[in-house]
């Protein structure tokens, strides 16, 4: 009986907490991160191992370019649930952004861990498309002397092609465009559009024409 009465006393608080949490999730989805963050932070103080809340806070920190904060959240998530591919992907992503904004020497010390994080995400989820995209972009953007490799970029692009025609064509187009093979890139983007990527493929093709080939997109 005492336990039942205690439950009744706590019930309004539980409902209120769930209501607040739901509102915070809607604020997050609407991109109102400053309003959502305090609710998630308060909830996490009372539930320090709540994975979803930790992920929300990591995502908010990432959106706000607070790389160090995001790194802390995702690192903790990896420790709490080392089998979740997305935690490694997100950790690698924010670590990569920190590296990009750091000086060259500091960045070099992070690149290895960034790659390993994306590779781990693929190991845990062999169909992880975003991690392969990240590796494609890393390998074409890095100079060869510090680990860049067109061969490895093509390897991951080919893997993408097996998972998704659109992502395979678009990623190969990005590789060709980066190495100034503009006609080849044009063909890859057109293949992506034909495969269904009318928006992203169309935008990439338009940017290629405008910035690299001095052409206009033909209207049907």
Predicted regions and their residues:
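Canonical tetratricopeptide repeat
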Residues: 52, 56-59, 90-93, 134, ...
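Residue-level recognition of tetratricopeptide repeat
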Residues: 50, 84, 128, 165-167, ...
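N-terminal leader/linker segments that initiate helical-solenoid repeat arrays
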Residues: 15-56, 62, 218
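A structural motif in tetratricopeptide-repeat
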Residues: 47, 81, 118, 125, ...
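Residue at a conserved register position within TPR or TPR-like alpha-solenoid repeats
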Residues: 27, 61, 95, 102, ...
